[in-house]
A protein has these predicted regions:
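Hydrophobic alpha-helical connector segments
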Residues: 1-31
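C-terminal peripheral helix-coil segments that are non-catalytic and often amphipathic
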Residues: 9, 13-14, 54, 61-69, ...
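Amphipathic alpha-helical interaction segments
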Residues: 13, 29-33, 81, 85, ...
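Amphipathic alpha-helical packing segments from all-alpha helical-bundle domains
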Residues: 25-29, 43-69
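Short helix-capping/turn signature of helix-turn-helix
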Residues: 34-41, 52
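All-alpha amphipathic helical-bundle segments outside canonical DNA-binding/catalytic cores
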Residues: 47-52, 69-84, 103
Length: 132
C-alpha cells in the first residue's frame, strides 16, 4: 500500500482495496469460501488463520504503523482495536449480509474513526484474545 503521508488517505485506500478484494476478485471469492469452510474444519481454520488472516492483518496494520512513524498516531493507540472497528463492517457486509461495499461506505468508516477523540486509544482494554 502506498504511503500518502496522511492517515485518513491511507485508511480510505486500505479499506477500499479490502472491499474490492473481498467482493470483486477471484481471490476474494476463494477467501470467502475458505472463511466459510474454516467454520467447520479445524485444520482449515488453523491454516487459514496462520497463512491468510495473519498476512491480511499485517496489511491492515500498515496505515497505522506509517502514521505512528509520522507522529500522527499516539503510541497508546490500540491498533488492533482500530483495525477491528474499521474492517469489521467491511467483512460483515461481504460475508454476512452480502451487501455492496461502495467507496462512500469505506470513506465514512475512515471518517468516523478519525473523528474519535482518542483515535482508538483504549488503555487497559484487551486488544485480542480477551473477553468481548
Amino acid at each position: 500500500m502506498a504511503d500518502h503521508g496522511d492517515l485518513g488517505s491511507d485508511l480510505r485506500e486500505q479499506l477500499s482495496q479490502l472491499a474490492a478484494f473481498l467482493s470483486k476478485t477471484d481471490a476474494g471469492e476463494i477467501f470467502r469460501a475458505l472463511a466459510g469452510q474454516a467454520q467447520h474444519d479445524p485444520a482449515v481454520a488453523a491454516r487459514f488463520a496462520s497463512e491468510v488472516v495473519a498476512r491480511q492483518r499485517e496489511r491492515d496494520r500498515a496505515p497505522f504503523l506509517q502514521a505512528r512513524r509520522r507522529g500522527q498516531l499516539a503510541e497508546a493507540t490500540d491498533i488492533d482495536l482500530a483495525i477491528d472497528q474499521l474492517v469489521g463492517p467491511v467483512y460483515y457486509r461481504v460475508l454476512v449480509t452480502r451487501q455492496s461495499v461502495p467507496p462512500a461506505f469505506t470513506d465514512a468508516l475512515a471518517a468516523r474513526y478519525l473523528a474519535q477523540p482518542a483515535r482508538g486509544s483504549t488503555a487497559g482494554e484487551p486488544t485480542s484474545g480477551g473477553s468481548r
